[in-house]
């Protein structure tokens, strides 16, 4: 029963995070697909249909500062590969999205490459190679301060991923627009590859796929609201990770009799 308290709390955090993410996606749809808060204003024609006056149709490149390629480096220090880094793989993306810091592999890259490839708070990492017949490439996650702190601000993505640095004011808008496109299957139409590994034509997607772009002040207001959801998801993820580690530490000691349940103050753990 004591161990199940850990599992129950971890599961509760997972469900809360799932709900928070759904709320953020619903808010995005309300604002930028259905235009609910703006229906009393004037609308104009565009190539994507009627949009609020003052908005425009553009592409992802209009709200992206730059993109970064990945680096896989070496398994151990070798020659000029001396900079220790942690690499985000496509397989790590689902965990990072849930707020789980995961276990990224350690690699060693050339120091000057790290200066240009190091990930920062607010960056997005996109999986550009992989996928399956039913799962598109293009899965994405955001880089948080908590993730950077855990890995000593030494994170890059692998060369099977690509990092995007959004314009700061559009970072949340870009992320949820990307998520909506991914869930709609749009990334399938930008894939190529005949060797069994699919590759995402990320440059084509960024430069060609038309999107609606709201004014900066609206993008900032959306960011302000969804940042609350995002920070709570990250906080819950950190808590669940700590609970998981503590559970795995206590369980063998409890089973061996080294520690009794009465020795553990569950009030301090589950407060």
Question: What are these language model-derived features?
Answer:
Residues 38-42, 73-80, 102-103, 189-191:
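Short coil/turn segments at secondary-structure boundaries
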Residues 1, 153-161, 187-220:
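A short glycine-rich beta-alpha junction/loop motif
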Residues 61-77, 91-127, 131-132, 146:
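Sequence-specific dsDNA recognition surfaces
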Residues 4, 112-113, 194:
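Short, solvent-exposed loop/turn positions at domain surfaces
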Residues 1-33, 38-72, 212, 216-262:
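Non-catalytic DNA-recognition/assembly elements of restriction-modification systems
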Residues 260, 264-271:
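Amphipathic heptad-repeat alpha-helical coiled-coil/stalk segments that mediate oligomerization
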Residues 94-105, 127-157, 172, 176, ...:
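Short, ligand-facing micro-motifs at secondary-structure edges
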Residues 162-183:
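Glycine- and charge-enriched low-complexity intrinsically disordered segments
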